[in-house]
Swiss-Prot record:
Function, as annotated: Catalyzes the decarboxylative condensation of pimeloyl-[acyl-carrier protein] and L-alanine to produce 8-amino-7-oxononanoate (AON), [acyl-carrier protein], and carbon dioxide.
Protein name: Putative 8-amino-7-oxononanoate synthase
Presence of keyword Protein transport: no
An annotated Gene Ontology molecular function: 8-amino-7-oxononanoate synthase activity
Protein species of origin: Anoxybacillus flavithermus (strain DSM 21510 / WK1)
Name of the top EC class for this enzyme: transferase
Family from the record: Belongs to the class-II pyridoxal-phosphate-dependent aminotransferase family. BioF subfamily.
Domain of life: Bacteria
Annotated substrate binding sites: R20, H131, T351
Co-factor requirement: pyridoxal 5'-phosphate
Pathway: Cofactor biosynthesis; biotin biosynthesis
Length: 390
C-alpha cells in the first residue's frame, strides 16, 4: 500500500536522524520566541534586520490600504501592478543593468532561469555545492549537467574542454554558498566563461544587500558585474521582504518573460510585498554602516570560534558553520545550545554532503558584540562538554 511505503520512508529518515519537523517560531529582532522562550537567533537570513524595520512595515501597510490584498492574476494576464514597474526600474538603477524581472521566489527564479536558457542542446556546469534550486533547475532543463568539484576551477576547465563545441554552455554558481559561507571564485569563472564562450549565471541570494558599495552583491564588490550574463538575487534575506529578481541585458529579460514557466504560470506578488520591495531597494543602498557592522561582527565571531578549536570550514562571510560530522551530534549540539538560550539549527544530509552535518550560524547586523561574546562562551562550553573541542 502507498501509505505504508510513505510511512516506511519517514521511519527510515528518523533512523538516520534526517527526519524534519516544523517548529513554531516568532522572530523578534535578533531574538526568536520558541515554546515560550526568548532565544538569541543564529538561524535567520534577516541579515540587516530589515524584516522588522518600521520603514518597510509602513510601506507594506500603505500598499495594502491603497491597492488591496491580492494580485488577482498572473503578471501576463492582469496582475502586472504598477508597483512592479516601479520596483524593476529601481532594480535597474541599483544593479546597473539594462533590465530586470521580479519573480516570486529564489527557488522559482533559478528553476526558471535554467529551464529557459538550457535544453537538450546545452551543457550546464554547476558547482557541486550550489543551492538545491539550481540543482533542480538544471535537472528540469533536460540539458546535459556537469557538476564540478566545489570552487575547483581546474576541474571546471577540464569539463569545459570536453564539452561538445556546438552546445550552449552555461556556468552557474552561488556567489556565497548558503551552508558554508565561502565565496565562489568569480574572477576565475569570468576568465573561463570568456575563454570557452559560456554564459555565466550567478545566484546572489546571500550577498544581495551585504556586499558591494550599495549592497548590489558580490559581483559588484569584485567589480565583475559587467561580465555576468544573468544576475539572480532575493528580497527575502538581507532586504527583509519576499520574492526574487533576475537582472541582465534587455534581450535576456524579454526572453524570460516569454519562456520562464515559473514566471508565466504563477499568480503575481501582492501589492504589500511590492511596496516593501520598493522601499527595501531604496534604503539598503544607504545602509553602508549596517553592512560594515555585520562584516565586523562576522570577522569577530569566526575568529573566536576558530581560536576555540571549532571547524568552520572555509567561511569568510556572515554565514559560519560549525562542522561536527554525524547527524546525531549535530542535533544534540543544537539541542544543548537551545537549552542555553541560542538557536542554531542542525543542517544534515541531503542538504550538505554525508559526514558533514553542521550547525549553521548566520549573523545579523542588529546583534551586538556583547551578545556575541556571551554566545561564543556558551558555544565553547557546550563544544567542550560534547568533546567537539579540547
Amino acid at each position: 500500500m502507498l501509505w505504508e511505503e510513505l510511512h516506511a520512508h519517514i521511519e527510515q529518515l528518523a533512523e538516520k536522524a534526517q527526519k524534519r519537523t516544523l517548529i513554531q517560531a516568532e522572530s523578534d529582532g535578533c531574538f526568536i520566541h520558541i515554546d515560550g522562550r526568548h532565544l538569541l537567533n543564529f538561524s535567520s537570513n534577516n541579515y540587516l534586520g530589515f524584516a522588522h524595520d518600521e520603514r518597510l512595515i509602513h510601506a507594506s501597510m500603505e500598499a495594502t490600504r491603497r491597492y488591496g490584498v491580492g494580485a488577482t492574476a498572473s503578471r501576463l494576464v492582469v496582475g502586472n501592478h504598477p508597483l512592479y514597474e516601479q520596483a524593476e526600474d529601481a532594480l535597474v538603477r541599483w544593479k546597473g543593468c539594462e533590465a530586470a524581472l521580479i519573480v516570486n521566489s529564489g527557488y522559482t527564479a533559478n528553476v526558471g532561469i535554467l529551464s529557459s536558457l538550457a535544453g537538450r542542446d546545452a551543457v550546464i556546469f554547476s558547482d557541486k555545492w550550489n543551492h538545491a534550486s539550481i540543482v533542480d533547475g538544471a535537472m528540469l532543463s533536460r540539458a546535459e549537467v556537469k557538476r564540478y568539484r566545489h570552487a575547483d576551477v581546474e576541474h571546471l576547465e577540464t569539463l569545459l574542454k570536453k564539452a561538445e563545441r556546438h552546445k550552449r554552455k552555461i556556468i552557474v554558481t552561488d556567489t556565497i554558498f548558503s551552508m558554508d559561507g565561502d565565496v565562489a571564485p568569480l574572477r576565475e569563472l569570468v576568465v573561463l566563461k570568456e575563454t570557452y564562450g559560456a554564459m555565466l549565471v550567478v545566484d546572489e541570494a546571500h550577498a544581495s544587500g551585504i556586499y558591494g558599495e550599495k549592497g548590489q552583491g558580490m559581483a559588484h564588490e569584485l567589480q565583475l558585474a559587467q561580465h555576468i550574463d544573468v544576475h539572480m538575487g532575493t528580497f527575502s534575506k538581507a532586504l527583509g521582504a519576499y520574492g526574487a529578481y533576475v537582472a541582465g541585458k534587455r534581450v535576456v529579460i524579454d526572453y524570460f518573460i516569454n519562456t520562464m514557466r515559473p514566471f508565466i504560470f504563477t499568480t503575481a506578488l501582492p501589492p504589500s510585498v511590492l511596496g516593501t520591495i520598493c522601499t527595501a531597494i531604496e534604503i539598503v543602498q544607504q545602509e553602508r554602516s549596517l553592512r560594515h557592522h555585520l562584516h565586523a561582527l562576522s570577522d569577530y565571531f569566526r575568529t573566536h570560534l576558530q581560536q576555540a578549536g571549532f571547524d568552520i570550514g572555509q567561511s569568510t562571510t556572515h554565514i559560519v558553520p560549525i562542522i561536527v560530522g554525524d547527524n546525531e551530534r549535530a542535533l544534540a549540539f543544537s539541542a544543548r545550545l537551545r537549552e542555553r538560550g541560542i538557536v542554531a539549527v542542525a543542517i544534515r544530509p541531503p542538504t550538505v554532503p554525508d559526514g558533514t552535518a553542521r550547525l549553521r550560524f548566520s549573523l545579523m547586523a542588529t546583534m551586538t558584540k556583547e551578545q556575541l561574546d556571551w554566545a561564543i562562551a556558551e558555544i565553547t562550553a557546550v563544544g567542550k562538554e560534547m568533546g567537539l573541542i579540547a
